[in-house]
Amino acid sequence: TVDAIDIIRSALIVVESPTKARAIAYFFGKPARRTINDFTVYEVASGQLILNVVASGGHIFDLTTEGGFHGVLKDEEEYIPVYTDIRRCSNCGEQFTDREECPVCGSRNIRSKRDVVELLRKLSMEVNKVFIATDPDAEGEKIGYDIYTIVKPYCKDVERLEFHEVTRKALRKALAEPRSIKLPYVQAQVVRRIEDRWVGFELSRRLWEKFKITTLSAGRVQTPVLG
């Protein structure tokens, strides 16, 4: 009936891990599945919502390695981080940006997170609402922010879910109390990522020059610990 059509709405829930996507879908019964370009999308009914649940697979974008100072441009007194899609080698699992072949094994069998971008765009056009349910920390907030920028042009109703345990009760509570993206968390993650990139790349370069071994690396966290 017309009333039923008005009441029943569809929503997309985006989490980080495929395991969590599956767990959430099974909270409400045995879900239907569909596969889009090797990604599994779960569909299940929950009250007045038809939920589509999918995983982003973690971060979608990272700082580029081309241009600026290790991916950060300087414009007078401003620093502008430049992001691009993350790529992963299907042979050895190495993660990188900006290259068409793996920097470790040389394989051209590469998966790009551009596939995730296209998936989220497609799914967001199919639903009335998008819930971003990435992890409740700074990393999760940055991933959530990136997802927001991807889906917002295609679905105007986008909100953030926060829950600290993967249970049906916690998810229902989060669905009843959605919030917006916490930009200070996003900004904190961006600053930390820039620090990681600057410190890690520069220290690693010096190690390569010193020991002539290009597989050595150093970073913001482990170097003070080792020191």
Language-model features: locations:
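Intrinsically disordered, low-complexity regulatory segments
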Residues: T1-R193, R197, E202, P224
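Charge-patterned, long linear interaction tracts outside catalytic cores
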Residues: S204-G227
